[in-house]
A protein has these predicted regions:
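Short secondary-structure capping/junction motifs at helix and strand boundaries
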Residues: 93-99, 130-137
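Short pre-catalytic strand/loop immediately N-terminal to key active-site residues, enriched for Gly-Thr
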Residues: 104-108, 283-285
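Glycine-rich active-site/cofactor-binding loop and its immediate structural neighborhood
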Residues: 293
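DPxDG-like acidic metal-binding loop motif
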Residues: 110-134
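Hydrophobic alpha-helical hairpins/lids featuring a short glycine-rich hinge
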Residues: 85, 89, 98-104
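A generic structural signal for short coil/turn motifs at secondary-structure boundaries
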Residues: 107-110, 259-260
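C-terminal nucleotide
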Residues: 1-14, 18-20, 26, 34-35, ...
């Protein structure tokens, strides 16, 4: 049996960090807004006639082998820890090789690990006979990723990976709901530049420091999160109205708020790229994910996307990513 799965990464436009439990419970109307992009995470599982389990990450150039009788040891396996814990959870009863690969740069802030998580869950669930319903994939992914990074994890990234498209994720005491946003996709694509800075980052540590401040009752942090909540609400409305002028203004106003929340969200290299883009046709910069490296999404003036891309491409270590909005989420097929 051969199983292949894929899932899209995402660009988060508004609401980042407020999706980490329990923070959203403290801000009525908490939501995030993001869109999926076709920089995919891919998984291939091929069953074997023996009891060997082979796990391989092409991106990390790591590959190791174990066996079904040692499956319990995968819970504490440090190599390819996410994959190991997922295999331990699903407990397959046949030997197999699982190979993973991501099209997004490592540490890009595009939810690469969360996306790979969903793609692995889809493939492994198929391997064990569709043991779990698709609506359980997101809580499984969040809980296992929390075991790996050892701090609470946000939820928005799993929704874009599983469902694709442009969406607002609403967080309420009775649960989370995904609202698909019907927007002018072509106009969004013509306005957004995604640039990888050449510097990977670790989102878990950055977000945990912010989470602790919030729970400890820091008034300034609480006020910033209220503003983050408001930005998500306003951006959702602007996107639904296809109001690109207002969209740019909302993103522009959100940037200093995010910097106040976490001054280390940008590095000197990122500051340089932001300044370069803003003088060549960008209206606003949105650091992807938790920042401190990774990617920046730039919202551009009408017909200025090419100018921004050209200016960024001239900077050392910067890589302008080629992308399209991805309407389709997780796909799993048996060959």
């Amino acid at each position: 049996m051969i199983i292949e799965s894929s899932a899209p990464t995402r660009v988060d436009l508004a609401g980042g960090t407020i999706d980490i439990p329990p923070l959203f419970l403290f801000h009525e109307g908490a939501a995030t807004v993001n869109f999926a992009v076709n920089l995919m995470a891919r998984v291939r599982i091929e069953t074997r006639p023996d009891d060997k389990i082979i796990l391989e990450s092409v991106d990390r150039d790591v590959k190791f082998e174990t066996s079904l009788d040692k499956l319990g040891e995968l819970y504490n396996e440090p190599r390819l820890e996410l994959l190991s814990k997922l295999v331990y959870f699903f407990k397959p009863e046949t030997g197999f090789q699982m190979t993973t690969e991501s099209e997004a740069p490592a540490g890009a802030g595009l939810a690469g690990s969360s996306t790979l998580n969903i793609a692995c869950i889809g493939a492994l669930n198929k391997l064990v006979g569709n043991r779990y319903a698709p609506e359980t994939f997101i809580p499984i992914a969040a809980n296992i990723e929390c075991q790996v990074i050892k701090v609470p994890t946000g939820f928005q990234d799993y929704y874009s990976a599983q469902y694709g498209g442009t969406a607002a994720i609403h967080f309420r005491p009775d649960g989370m709901t995904r609202e698909a946003l019907n927007i002018d996709t072509k106009s969004l694509e013509e306005r957004i530049v995604i640039c990888y800075t050449g510097e990977p980052r670790n989102s878990g540590t950055n977000n945990w420091e912010i989470t602790k401040r919030h729970i400890d009752g820091d008034a300034e942090t609480f006020a910033i999160f209220e503003g983050i909540r408001d930005s998500s609400r306003d951006l959702r409305e602007a996107l639904l109205a296809n109001d690109w002028v207002q969209t740019g203004e909302i993103l522009k106003a959100a940037y200093p708020r995010r910097k106040n929340l976490s001054p280390n969200i940008t590095t000197p290299q990122m500051d340089l790229l932001i300044a370069r883009a803003l003088t060549n046709g960008a209206i606003a910069a949105k650091v992807c994910g938790a920042g401190g490296g990774g990617c920046i999404a730039f919202f551009c003036e009408e017909n200025r996307k090419a100018d921004v891309e050209k200016a960024l491409a001239e900077e050392k270590d910067a890589e302008v990513l080629r992308w399209n909005l991805c309407e389709r989420g997780l796909t799993v097929r048996e060959l």
